[in-house]
Amino acid sequence: MTAERPGAVPLGRPGRPPMLGLGEAYRAQVFASIFLLLLSPAGVGARAKNDFNLVHPLVTMEQLLWVSGKQIGSVDTFRIPLITTTPRGTLLAFAEARKMSASDKGAKFIALRRSMDQGSTWSPTAFIVDDGETPDGLNLGAVVSDTTTGVVFLFYSLCAHKAGCRVASTMLVWSKDDGISWSSPRNLSLDIGTEMFAPGPGSGIQKQWAPQKGRLIVCGHGTLERDGVFCLLSDDHGASWRYGSGISGIPYGQPKRENDFNPDECQPYELPDGSVVINARNQNNYHCRCRIVLRSYDACDTLRPRDVTFDPELVDPVVAAGAVATSSGIIFFSNPAHPEFRVNLTLRWSFSNGTSWRKETVQIWPGPSGYSSLATLEGSVGGEDQAPQLYVLYEKGRNRYTESISLAKVSVYGTL
């Protein structure tokens, strides 16, 4: 049965001609007003905002933000890109600056660059967190903004691999001035304990619709102590944090083999019905060489096994991927589109909440490519309306994907 659209009024009744009594005359006046509104500039703009026929993604610019090989601050390797747009329209790009080697372990900085002109120019690299000479240093991470307060939160983990250390910690820094300055690190162990939680890598979200409108959600994965995917939640603008329940790997708490169920690095986004989709790395290729998709209907208080699916269209070589939902209902997804190797960084999009994907794709880079992160810039920027832009920050190389981190700017409507 097709539901009647809110506010729709039937003209007349079946079996009898429509009569313009007082009620019908009023309805006719309403429909005339709506018709005139749709012809107005405001109405045309509103329709264009959700007109999927306008969507023709086009890469309009690309630039390297970081190059590995001790070329920037004697950093050996830059990895794990994160990108976000702040409520004020500033772009913030983050990466792990691995001091001595490309290893996931070892000492690191968190590198940051800012753009205030929609990605055209970027500030010099700033190192906003330094873990010293820690043998099992920091690992990024997830970034999320609160649209009410304007605060940007950045999460990372310490001692994730228990290499030369015994206690894992989830750490948090924040900025109240669009990334110009940052707080001292806050250890969340008193709030959430010391089980290893690896945020992201990618972006968190703030709920835009009920249930729990305004909630901040940051999802990640654990290890043998608490493997699988689970999320950190805040209902007080980031003052306090707690875990929602998660989806565990199978067999739980034991080493995994090929084809075991083991969801890993993940990226959440919200659908217009208020549900949250978590697109996750399929660490052991359970069921397919593709992405695991989880869905929560209560703002990530719970994740249920019956709401876990697999997306065979999103072929994946076991990697952290980018995913984002635009305000007009488009879902974008980026990953190295190959079943085995980290090559062919590809952008895909969906007009059906991710239940299917358009046949058209945009190849961002054909060669070695690894992790990627997505952000959008929509609506008014600096008081001026603009066409929506998508930003793809990704690991890129000619021989190895760890050679650099590059930014591709994509015009969603294909306009320059």
Swiss-Prot record:
One of its GO terms (biological process) is oligosaccharide catabolic process. Substrate binds at residues 79, 98, 265, 281, 342. It catalyses: Hydrolysis of alpha-(2->3)-, alpha-(2->6)-, alpha-(2->8)- glycosidic linkages of terminal sialic acid residues in oligosaccharides, glycoproteins, glycolipids, colominic acid and synthetic substrates. One of its GO terms (cellular component) is lysosomal membrane. It is found in: Lysosome membrane; Lysosome lumen; Cell membrane; Cytoplasmic vesicle. Its main location: membrane. Glycans are attached at residues 187, 344, 353. The keyword Nucleotide-binding does not apply. BNR repeats lie at residues 113-124, 173-184, 232-243, 348-359. A motif (FRIP motif) lies at residues 78-81. It holds the Pfam family BNR_2. The keyword Plastid does not apply. Its EC number is 3.2.1.18. A C-terminal internalization signal (YGTL) appears to allow the targeting of plasma membrane proteins to endosomes. Belongs to the glycosyl hydrolase 33 family. Catalyzes the removal of sialic acid (N-acetylneuraminic acid) moieties from glycoproteins and glycolipids. To be active, it is strictly dependent on its presence in the multienzyme complex. Appears to have a preference for alpha 2-3 and alpha 2-6 sialyl linkage. This is Sialidase-1. It comes from Sus scrofa (Pig). The gene is NEU1.
